[in-house]
Structure formats: C-alpha cells, structure tokens
A protein has these predicted regions:
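TPR alpha-solenoid repeat register
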Residues: 51, 87, 120-121, 138, ...
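Alpha-helical segment of the N-proximal tetratricopeptide repeat
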Residues: 13-47, 54-61
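"A position-specific structural signal for the A-helix of alpha-solenoid helical repeats
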Residues: 20, 54, 90, 134, ...
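Structural signature of tandem alpha-helical TPR/SEL1-like repeats
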Residues: 28-36, 64-76, 98-107, 151-157
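Conserved structural position within tetratricopeptide repeats
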Residues: 9, 40-43, 75-79, 110-113, ...
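Register position in tetratricopeptide repeats
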Residues: 27, 61-63, 97, 148, ...
C-alpha cells in the first residue's frame, strides 16, 4: 500500500487522475459508473472529504435516488470539513431528500446569508461565478423547502429572487423553467 493511501489522502498525481476520471464520467452522465468509482475512492481515501461530497451529490441524482446513503456520505464530508460551502450545500440537499426540511432550510440560508466574497475567495473558494451559482442554487432550494413546508409566501419570495439573480449563461443546477413552474403552482395555492 502506498503512502498516500495509508494517510487517507490522495497524492497530487492520484488527485489529477481522480479529477480526470470524474470529469469524464460527468460528461457522459454515467452516474452508476461514477458511484462505483467514488465508492472505491472513498474507501481508499477516507480523509478526502471532496470524494465523499461528490459521492453524496451523485447518490441523490434522480436515476440513483439513494437518499439515505447520500446523507451518510454528506454527513461524513461535513464532519471532515464543515466550513466548505459546497459541503454545506450538499449536506443541505441530502437533509432535504431524507425529509429533514427545517434543518435543510437552516443550511441553505447559511449559504444565502454568507458574504459572497468569502464564498468566492475564502479557503475553499473557486471564484465569483461559482459563488453566485452556489448562492442562487441555495435560494432556489430554500424556495423548494418552504413550498414543502407550506410556507408559500416565503417560497414565492425565494423563487422570485432566484429568477432575478439568474443571469444568461450562468450555470445552475436548476432552470428558469423549473422556478417559474414552482411559482405557477404557488399562485394556485
């Protein structure tokens, strides 16, 4: 067993190989293959929170829908690195999928209320575009949670805010169509 495996962390070389494999599987939308690979890496590198976070996010993809297992990996990633905003977002999503709506809402609002500069350029930051996307996706999910909790006016406010903040060509896990669909459902309530 090599040194990086014993420490629970990847070497720089192993990390590059991992990222390359991960990106290829994402491009192909090969979710089952991604789960298989990520489980191998999670076992081999238990201290690499990013592996656990990616596995959690993949497990709650519709075609996989292993929500309780996703929660376990998201929780593990949070235990390793509770200050990473992507971990917080993934954990909040996992909480949502297992029905812990109030707690999920707390974590989404934690991201929403965080300073955008800190998200963009802090220890785990990946730039302003990433920070805007993460905050706006959290706004969308806060709307979804409020809708499920029957807090309809609050849900409307979040969906309107999401649409106002959504810029052309800005990446998001969600579409304008999804947000407007939620809004139209809420106008009938």
């Amino acid at each position: 067993m090599n040194e990086d495996t014993e420490s629970g962390y990847m070497s720089a070389r192993a990390s590059k190989i991992f990222q390359s494999k991960l990106e290829l599987l994402k491009r192909e939308s090969n979710w089952a293959g991604m789960v298989k690979m990520l489980k191998r890496y999670a076992k081999r590198y238990p201290n690499e929170y990013y592996v656990h976070q990616q596995l959690a996010a993949t497990l709650y993809v519709d075609s996989i829908a292993q929500f309780h297992l996703a929660f376990q990996y998201a929780e593990h990633a949070m235990n390793i690195e509770p200050d990473d905003d992507l971990n917080i977002y993934t954990y909040a999503c996992a909480l949502y999928y297992i029905g812990q709506l109030e707690k999920s809402f707390e974590f989404f609002t934690k991201i929403i209320n965080k300073d955008i500069q800190e998200i963009a350029y802090g220890e785990h930051g990946e730039g302003l575009r990433y920070a805007k996307q993460l905050i706006n996706d959290s706004v969308y999910m806060a709307g979804v949670v409020c809708q499920r909790l029957h807090r309809y006016n609050e849900a409307k406010d979040y969906f309107v805010r999401y649409l106002e903040n959504k810029k052309p060509f800005q990446y998001s896990d969600f579409t304008k169509r999804q947000a407007t669909s939620h809004l139209s459902e809420l106008t009938n309530v």
